[in-house]
Amino acid sequence: MLKLKDVSELGKHIVVQGGTMRNDAVVRALEQLTGAQVIRCDMPELMGAFGCAIYAREHCNTLVSLDEIVSQAHYSTHLLHCKGCDNQCQVFRYHFDNGKNYYSGNRCEKVFTNGSKEQPGENIYRFKNELLFGRSKTVPEKPRMVVGIPRSLNMYENFPFWHTLLTACGIEVRLSGESTYSGYEQSARMVMSDNICFPAKLVHGHVQNLIAQKVDRIFLPFVIFERKGKEQNSYNCPVVTGYSEVVKSVQSSGIPIDSPAISFKDEDLLYKQCSNYLKSLGVEESQIKEAFAKATEVQEDYAASLVAHNKQVLENARQQKHMVVLLAGRPYHTDMLIQHKISDVLADMGIDVISDDIVRENGQKIENVHFLAQWSYPNRILEAAQWCAAQGDDVQFVELTSFGCGPDAFLVDEVRDVLIRNGKTFTLLKLDDINNVGSMKLRIRSLIESMKLFHEHRAGRKEQNTAVAVSECKDHYKNKKILVPYFTPFISPLIPAIMRLAGYDVENLALSNAESCEWGLKYANNEVCYPATLIVGDVVKAFKSGRYNPEETVVAMTQTGGQCRASNYVSLIKKALEEAGYPHTPVLSLTFGSSLENKQPGLKVNWIKILPVALRAILYSDCISKFYYAAAAREKEVGQAARLRDDFLQQAEGLIRDKRSKDLLDLLSVAAEQFNAICRDMNCPKVGVVGEIFLKFNPFAQKNVIGWLTEKGIEVVPSVLTDFFMQNFVNRKVRVESCIQKSAMPDFVYKSAYKIINKQIGKFNKAGMKFRYFIPFKDIFEEAADARKVISLNAQFGEGWLLPAEIMSYARQGIFNVVSLQPFGCIANHIVSKGVEKRIKYFFPEMNILSLDFDSGVSDVNITNRLLLFVDHLK
């Protein structure tokens, strides 16, 4: 795949080759996309063969013809059938008198491989596997119990710690077997999300393996933070953190699955978490202290051994003048099934293989990148890329990534840029459950050969600038136009008025459209989540329109700093603006958090002044949305509800601008009466809508699913923005109780704030009840209590536990039909939506959930067909 942002880089004449280019439609599509003349010979599929022939002729050193070689050769032919897979290819083996064999007919190189045998290189991954899992098999004399640990995900990072901790507490540890394809296939039916990464899919097989071993308990910790260096944060991705919740939902074997919340970022908190868990198993405090100290030491020794061995391999390779490949990936890419033994393939070619673990103790700060360093494993990969970029040509970089890996949609482009800016090549191998070693070998051989040519031509090549353009703008925001993405028809119209009170000139971008998709795909990685594609596209589209002066305009974007990919939107927009030709346009971060580092600092807002206004505006807009959707399904004349919605939002904007936000309550009472007047007295089928926050509120992003349902006479019961913010009171309480964080303020401060806000919610509930179809706001702690039955409240990534809480709340109201709107491949919703669907249906068997995934290429027909089937179920 060719990622091209500026077609002029290709020139006016383009020559294409390869079998794909025999397709006239492909060639014509390229002409239309580039606007250039595309030239193709009559045999494009043979151009590579011609190239090989020309290369061979230029390097020939004998005058023996091909016919002479064949006539002088003495060989025997044997017909074989390969048993490497179900294809059972017919393979011919040619055995020559000198003892060598040549195979033909094989469609891959899994079993029968041609090529000379080289002295194999060192493979750090074999050493790492043994160092990780080759622990003492000594079993406590009288074990308290047998705890099984799946050989999966972050156990490839922390197994030495957990094995030592549990064993030292008198608990026998049983590890699941090595990953096998048969184990994966037998448990594939348990995978709740088809597009989740392969490493996650393997977890079910490992859990089944432990169930078969009849362990007493299974240990799958809910690890939120890994150990932190100089990076901004050290989160795990939502899949690594929360997959235990999916396992609990689908694998009910009667064996308890323990998933205590864990943070390796703070050793004091880590001890409390371990202590609380072990005490629940009957372990004494004195034994826990000793075991914890020992486990910490063993984990540190493991990390130090990895670093030392990597450095030793590198030193030996340089002494022997061997090529070295830094094969980077997540810790679980150490699993030979996940990586398809790529490290062995490299080593068999005589290459010495090291891993990203070589930078574990570097303490190197990630610089000159458009990337929020929030995830632990990607941070290490990026540090390794920076380290590799500073090395000589004898060290090259290859990255392993799994299909469906959310963070890598941001990471891969930055790794590529870091290497290319420093004159290094970048090779990316994308892995899933399909084993295609032959294709990967070809890419690796291509890398090696290209490096030989690279060395030959390096002398005349100029190094590229390593600087990343960052525009800082500290004091002039109030004199500039600030653009913000369009979010929802209900709160977005009020945002400029709210920010005007803070002294800022804020303007909403236009609602996304098909052009936004095109610009977004051009300037963002095509695997980022759909909302990111649209937001980047909206921003670039605005500047390309010529309506805004990039020197006098600023872009602002919210930033949560959590485990979700949305925290990287600010970096993504910066990168897009730079590549689109607007490097001096600042991008501001709107955040309450202090853990986010942004060289373009956030707005200085007097939140004490603005928050009461913002709260009233959010509550008012949520109430109007409740009025609108209930009335739209019952309106006496088509369009009445929409006109009232727009009218009352416009009036609210005027009140806010006039600093009369307290009058919103009176205006809401008037709105309730007028919405009552346009409604027919009738019952309608009801559908709840949940999902990713941008999709469920933005009409274009969801392809107007909510509008489609309303047109069918269905009352949509919407999610509300209020709950999204109110969940922070629950989140903070849960994080402190789970020892994920220390309390920064006394509890009474939060309790007082909660009471003040809850009182305001009560006032809006009272005014809203004047509309006869109004459904009042629920208490967020009551919703959390329902959610706790199906998922850990530490699941605070993406929509977090709030999404299943909303579904449970609908069920309590008698609404058993719910549409869940998700970006395709959303890593958070793999856990909090599809992942716990079975658990929700355990409590409410009649619950009917339709999950719809969206991206820029989703079929309108497919969405409509699925909605039609869903609507039929309502009748």
Map each language-model feature to its residues:
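Hydrophobic/aromatic-enriched cytosolic interaction surfaces used to assemble or bind macromolecules
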Residues: 34, 48, 57-58
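An N-terminal assembly and electron-transfer interface module characteristic of large anaerobic redox
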Residues: 42-43, 60-875
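PAZ/PAZ-like end-binding module
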Residues: 39
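Phosphate/ATP-binding catalytic cores across multiple sugar-kinase/actin-like superfamilies
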Residues: 1-11, 803
